[in-house]
Amino acid sequence: MPDNSSIANCCAASGLAARPSWPGSAEAEPPETPRAPWVAPMLSTVVIVTTAVDFVGNLLVILSVLRNRKLRNAGNLFVVNLALADLVVALYPYPLILVAILHDGWVLGEIHCKASAFVMGLSVIGSVFNITAIAINRYWCICHSATYHRACSQWHAPLYISLIWLLTLVALVPNFFVGSLEYDPRIYSCTFIQTASTQYTMAVVAIHFLLPIAVVSFCYLRIWILVLQARRKAKAERKLRLRPSDLRSFLTMFAVFVVFAICWAPLNCIGLAVAINPEAMALQIPEGLFVTSYFLAYFNSCLNAIVYGLLNQNFRREYKRILSALWSTGRCFHDASKCHLTEDLQGPVPPAAMATIPVQEGAL
């Protein structure tokens, strides 16, 4: 899936940046049209909220699976892997985007620019492949339960996860040969420039978005058909052995897929349209639409943990336990520090006062 800055380097018109370049360089050009004063505060708020929810939410997902034995299964290892893919952008690229917004330009140098763009791509493509793997896992678990445990045990899952990240790295390699990693001032982000090759951009959209969407849609469609058959016929239900936990897991991951598709579809549609007809489409796409589609895609990284909490009772229960434990620990530290502070303010009890305190008989 492309970070579609395929219109980032097009001619400056309709308020589009003429060419991403480093601040202070000889090639740097000011934007044709200044931004509205509310744009930077709004984008910074979106980035801060997304980063905070992403960090806390995905940590809760990981801790929930590690703590709860009911959640510690082969299927949820892919969920943890997806949470890690979402978490990594909250640790590196998003804070750098916030710095760029606050400085109204990139001030962290070329190395951080290229590295943040690479990490962003790693997270996005890793998420796509993880969601696809989860759909295949759910399909196999529900539709082919007889062979599921032989092929998808907890010992096999790490191999599949390693394969996912290997394919993710392979998918990122062509970007270093086809185009460069540069800063796009419209989205305050360093991203992959897709103008070098129309064919490459179309291939990226097809392989990283359309193909996974097709595979996931097929898997979930087959599951829906079998679920409906199981509800209508008691015999089919016995054959399928549909457990409530399997259905809950399926519905949760189906919701994750729908949210992902909604968040990333606008940006990929823009990239595909520009790839098909770059000269005509690049100038017709409003900058506001492009920026909105980009930040909608960024926002997706914090939504999965919310979906788990809303739709999966085991995750919701574990969230409450973790947050309650953290709250209790925080109160203990607060009460202890308050107690020590009171003792320090009152000072030691003088001997004369000690003498006036009656000692009860038998007291220790």
Curated annotation (Swiss-Prot):
Gene Ontology CC annotations of this record: plasma membrane
SUPFAM superfamilies noted in UniProt: Family A G protein-coupled receptor-like
Membrane topology listed for this record: Multi-pass membrane protein
InterPro entries xref list: GPCR_Rhodpsn, GPCR_Rhodpsn_7TM, Melatonin_rcpt
Cellular location(s): Cell membrane
Transmembrane segments: 46-66, 82-102, 116-136, 159-179, 201-221, 256-276, 288-308
Signal sequence, renumbered to the chain: 1-28
Extracellular side stretches: 29-45, 103-115, 180-200, 277-287
Keywords, ordered alphabetically: Cell membrane, Disulfide bond, G-protein coupled receptor, Membrane, Receptor, Signal, Transducer, Transmembrane, Transmembrane helix
Disulfide bridge map: 113-190
Entry-linked Gene3D superfamilies: Rhodopsin 7-helix transmembrane proteins (1.20.1070.10)
GO biological process, one term: negative regulation of insulin secretion
Ranges per topology, Cytoplasmic: 67-81, 137-158, 222-255, 309-364
GO MF assignments: G protein-coupled receptor activity; melatonin receptor activity
Tissue: Expressed in the hippocampus, kidney, and ovary.
Highest taxon of the lineage: Eukaryota
Main location as per UniProt: membrane
Annotated family: Belongs to the G-protein coupled receptor 1 family.
Physiological role: High affinity receptor for melatonin. The activity of this receptor is mediated by pertussis toxin sensitive G proteins that inhibits adenylate cyclase activity.
Protein's recorded name: Melatonin receptor type 1B
Natural source organism: Rattus norvegicus (Rat)
